[in-house]
């Protein structure tokens, strides 16, 4: 966070709370947090074994990378990330932030990344937990997940659920959905504007062609 932000607790839940007046000035109705649960920051790549026994001495040394984004299956999904807390109690600090957002008329949404190794029932359990424990208003769910499991869950009936691609036709057919809480998180406009601001070529179509039309083209409909 830039020093001009005026935030004392940069990179923390308290810091977000300090920016609430700014969010209100922007006129937004809520904020979407990237993964803010506890996840593994240290990513170690596997060592490459030599093709022949005598080449083992020459194998690459293990490289260590830092994961600052949180999009990994190596996570402890039930607790707020301690590294984003300005106090010794990240749970209390996160809850205080959510309450402050609600008092200001703002919603708090979160991104959750699930990899292919996780059981669908556990994914649902995690999202339910954050809804009940932390009063999160919505979730952007990333990964190969069973959308129907979330969209038809009564506990999440009034919870915003965002997916990269929402297959409403398959899930609902010609019927009216019981809970109108699902939406497609389409990043086309976001990336189009980013490319235009960078001065990239051929960005006009990327921005002005309706996103729905492009999505249907990608899906082959």
Ranges and model annotations:
Residues 5-11, 43-103, 116-134:
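Aromatic- and acidic-residue-enriched carbohydrate-binding clefts of CAZyme catalytic domains
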Residues 21-24, 95-104, 150-155:
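Surface-exposed amphipathic alpha-helices with a cationic face
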Residues 31-33, 108-110, 139, 161-163:
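Hydrophobic faces of well-ordered beta-strands that scaffold small-molecule active sites
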Residues 35, 41-48, 173-174:
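Short, solvent-exposed loop/turn and secondary-structure capping segments
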């Amino acid at each position: 966070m830039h020093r001009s932000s005026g935030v004392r607790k940069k990179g923390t839940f308290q810091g977000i709370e300090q920016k609430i007046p700014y969010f209100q000035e922007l006129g937004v109705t809520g904020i979407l947090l990237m993964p803010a649960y506890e996840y593994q920051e240290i990513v170690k790549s596997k060592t490459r074994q030599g093709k022949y026994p005598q080449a083992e001495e020459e194998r690459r040394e293990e490289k260590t990378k830092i994961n600052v984004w949180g999009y990994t299956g190596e996570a402890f999904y039930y607790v707020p990330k301690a590294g984003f807390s300005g106090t010794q109690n990240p749970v209390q600090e996160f809850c205080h932030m959510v309450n402050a957002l609600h008092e200001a008329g703002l919603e708090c949404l979160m991104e959750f990344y699930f990899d292919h190794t996780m059981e669908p029932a556990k994914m649902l359990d995690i999202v339910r937990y954050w809804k009940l424990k932390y009063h999160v208003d919505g979730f952007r769910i990333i990964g190969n997940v069973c959308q129907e499991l979330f969209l038809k869950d009564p506990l999440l009936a009034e919870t915003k659920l965002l997916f990269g691609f929402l297959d409403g036709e398959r899930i609902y057919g010609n019927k009216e959905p019981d809970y109108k809480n699902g939406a497609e998180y389409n990043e086309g406009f976001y990336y189009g504007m980013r490319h235009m601001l960078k001065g990239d070529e051929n960005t006009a179509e990327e921005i002005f062609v309706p996103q729905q039309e492009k999505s249907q083209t990608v899906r082959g409909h």
